Amino acid sequence: VDKPDYRPRPRPPNM
């Protein structure tokens, strides 16, 4: 089972 490359998600806007 090959794991997909996880890309760093952009931080959500702090509201």
UniProtKB/Swiss-Prot annotation:
Gene induction: By bacterial infection.
Alphabetic keyword roster: Antibiotic, Antimicrobial, Immunity, Innate immunity
Any coiled-coil regions, as ranges: none
Signal peptide interval: none
GO cellular component, one term: extracellular region
BP terms from Gene Ontology: defense response to Gram-negative bacterium; innate immune response
Keyword Calcium: no
Disulfide bonds: none
Function comment: Antibacterial peptide active against Gram-negative bacteria.
UniProt protein name: Metalnikowin-1
Organism of origin: Palomena prasina (Green shield bug)
Lineage: Eukaryota, Metazoa, Ecdysozoa, Arthropoda, Hexapoda
